[in-house]
Amino acid sequence: MPASPPELPIVVLDALMPTTQRLVLNRRGSMVWEVQSHRGRYAVKVGYPIEATADWPAQPWTALAPAREGAVLHRLGFVDFAYGEWDQGTWNFQPWREGADLHQLWEPCRRPGSSIAPRASVAASCVQALAELHAKGWVHGDVQPAHFIIGPEQTHLIDLALARGGDVPKGYDFPFRGCLVHYEAPEIARSVLATGEAEPTEEADIYALGASLLISATGWRAMEYPDGAPRLVQREAVATGRRRPVKVRGELGELVDAMLSPAPEDRPTIYEVGKALN
């Protein structure tokens, strides 16, 4: 990308006619804006390809991710969104979700010497959001704390670019090559190491939710590997099940441990997790 400040694609400007806009994120093939317009408040996602560096191979799929997410939103029956192409990739816009993400909300639990236990009601709202996706026959594939937005009325599960469960246009589709390794289930890590690809599952989503609850409540990753380790080293640690001996305080502890079981068949279902919390 050029060094000049990024701008929204013309087609998005024409569609939304922003009154205000704020660049929230611009890294590794993805830009996100918060946009206010006469139509309402929107998140605008713009993708572009990642060029190869000494540390990273080229990643052309990042250019397709916003349109792929838009196609998923369409299949799931969402409204008030759009997606399309621009000269360096694809874009989408969708309603802005107000609230703090899971990691932000549980920050008081992670303070040194804190006696604050994570609230089971917050965990239950995250479970409900994931359960609604699973009930429609889809898996998320990229469950992590930043993707749960706990709003005033409900919790939203966002960022569906890697979701699987139905057809998306071939021109926007790409293989699943794993997710953020901190939340990647061991079986997913092993498949990516062996073949370069994997098939996301409900069981892997459950693991990722458990890892999300753990790190948000304690500040510790589920698996043990050095801070700043290369992704390959991280993934190898996950694949071998090198579990960190840390537990969530309070009533969530045993449940999160079960969700992080190394064998997918030993993890509770989303229904069982919800029942345990309610």
Describe the residue ranges of each PLM region.
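Conserved short submotifs of the Hanks-type protein kinase catalytic core
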Residues: 89-101
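A conserved short helix/loop substructure at the end of the activation segment
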Residues: 261-272
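ATP-binding glycine-rich loop module of kinase domains
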Residues: 28-71
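Catalytic-loop of the protein kinase fold
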Residues: 134-150
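Activation segment/activation loop of eukaryotic-type protein kinase catalytic domains
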Residues: 151-182
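Short beta-strand micro-motifs within the conserved protein kinase catalytic domain, predominantly
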Residues: 80-91
